[in-house]
């Protein structure tokens, strides 16, 4: 559970780097996804897949807004530890 909260916090920190007008959308999107997946099977494999998906989606959004991917380094460390 702690890792899930750390990943969520990492995603929300990245949302703060986005342009002000797009932050509410992505903050809501991230929250809804984390809430929807809280019922997921707690096997290690499925959580790892969700963490990888969160990281990949974060990279896509950063790239969309021309933000350097290195901003997601900490999230990568959390997701793949």
Swiss-Prot record:
The UniProt entry, under InterPro entries, shows: Complex1_LYR_LYRM9
What do the Gene Ontology cellular component annotations say?
Answer: cytosol
Q: Which CDD domains match?
A: Complex1_LYR_LYRM9 (cd20269)
Coiled-coil annotation reads none
- UniProt family annotation: Belongs to the complex I LYR family. LYRM9 subfamily.
The protein, known as: LYR motif-containing protein At3g19508
């Amino acid at each position: 559970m702690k890792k899930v909260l750390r990943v969520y916090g990492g995603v929300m920190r990245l949302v703060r780097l986005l342009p002000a007008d797009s932050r509410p959308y992505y903050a809501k999107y991230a929250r809804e996804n984390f809430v929807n997946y809280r019922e997921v099977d707690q096997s290690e494999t499925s959580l790892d897949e969700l963490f990888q998906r969160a990281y990949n989606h974060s990279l896509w959004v950063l790239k969309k807004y021309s933000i350097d991917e290195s901003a997601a380094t900490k999230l990568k460390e959390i997701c793949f530890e």
